[in-house]
Amino acid sequence: MVRVELQAASLMNGSSAAEEPQDALVGGDACGGRRPPSVLGVRLAVPEWEVAVTAVSLSLIILITIVGNVLVVLSVFTYKPLRIVQNFFIVSLAVADLTVAVLVMPFNVAYSLIQRWVFGIVVCKMWLTCDVLCCTASILNLCAIALDRYWAITDPINYAQKRTLRRVLAMIAGVWLLSGVISSPPLIGWNDWPMEFNDTTPCQLTEEQGYVIYSSLGSFFIPLFIMTIVYVEIFIATKRRLRERAKASKLNSAMKQQMAAQAVPSSVPSHDQESVSSETNHNELPPPPAPPSKEKRRKTKKKSKKKEQAAEEGRFLAPAMVAEDSVTDNSVSVGPVARNHLAEDGYTCTTTTTTTTTTTAVTDSPRSRTASQKGSTAPPTPVQPKSIPVYQFIEEKQRISLSKERRAARTLGIIMGVFVVCWLPFFLMYVIVPFCNPSCKPSPKLVNFITWLGYINSALNPIIYTIFNLDFRRAFKKLLHFKT
């Protein structure tokens, strides 16, 4: 409550003192009384500089909250990759946060600056009810998102069949229905609001102890407990999957080394990406490749010309692939897998057989970009084929998956950290104040700061839940007409 104290003003002769009402100072007096700050004729309770800083700061928070949550809603309904059932939880969360920004925050800004409620008792009751409703819906939507992620991770096959549009909409309806059940009791009498209401009566949440316990449990402490258990389980499952994928990555590396050892003889230095091999045993040599058809040679020649043009412009560098050995009456051929990759990229393989030496060369243009070597003493040229072997592809996919799992674990920590930092101070204050004596009550500025700390969670939610999602980032850029 803002108490307007009457100030004693000294008379010119000093014989007596008279009290002047605060209204007399609004227009100033003959003795040079200072005019209190006002906006549009409404007296303010704080200095003008504080009014400006507070108004700009809080208005910026409101603007960020509105823009961010509107972008989330539009992204889900306009960007096709985001039109999936689980994203309706994000839409429900965005709607709750949007109502906080539109229906709750502006009245709090005015109340913070004026320090009096000038909108009447009906608007006061509706504002407080809307405050509890929307903030509770925002928190319960966070809880629903946590449960959805938990079921999707711990039971992915069964939950994928259960996660239907009807089920998701039913969960969202339950969130809003439960929020209404928690926020509505003060409207039907469970409150300690005064019977008479004027502009000096504070518009504040009821401090009726029974309702405070009831609403704080339903709005925060029970959802916090559920989210903590769920995210701990998700974190444990994520760490377990990280360990499993790390083991799979090590196994894949061992398989890669084994395959490389089998593909390259001991007399020839092995390379992870080498695709050419030769053996001295006639029985172990693969049969020479069949000569390509005229049509295939024509297409290969055409592709080779394109590769050569690119090379001349400095945009392409053909890999040299050479493997040789001294054998008698044997032909050395490129393995079938490597040959297929080379044919796709426009390379041609030529094999020359003599009685003393075998030369295998790979050319990438009609100008005979050929690397060859005769004799068995020269070391082979390292091979760098353009195509990626299967085991390298699997290893790359596992590496990407490990990176995603680590980011997911880090995201869980950010979600819980932001939620607790924003809302825990408010609900601790909300529960403690009704049970303590007047001397332990916090100052109005501290109350306002803690309240807005909770509101800020509505501005951060669209950032947290979308900044780590590539599809949402693309949708935002598309909506804002940013070039990607």
Swiss-Prot record:
Top-level taxon: Eukaryota
InterPro entries recorded:
GPCR_Rhodpsn (IPR000276), GPCR_Rhodpsn_7TM (IPR017452), Octopmn_rcpt (IPR002002)
Bias class Basic residues marks the residues at 295-306
The primary location reported for this protein is membrane
Coiled-coil portions: none
Pfam families listed in its UniProt record: 7tm_1 (PF00001)
Q: SUPFAM superfamilies per the record?
A: Family A G protein-coupled receptor-like (SSF81321)
Question: Any transmembrane segments, and where?
Answer: 55-77, 88-109, 127-147, 168-190, 216-237, 412-433, 449-470
- Side of membrane Cytoplasmic, spans: 78-87, 148-167, 238-411, 471-484
Q: Which residues are glycosylated?
A: 13, 198
Molecular function terms, GO-annotated:
octopamine receptor activity
Family statement: Belongs to the G-protein coupled receptor 1 family.
The name this protein carries in UniProt is Tyramine receptor 1
Q: Which organism is it from?
A: Locusta migratoria (Migratory locust)
This protein's encoding gene: GCR1
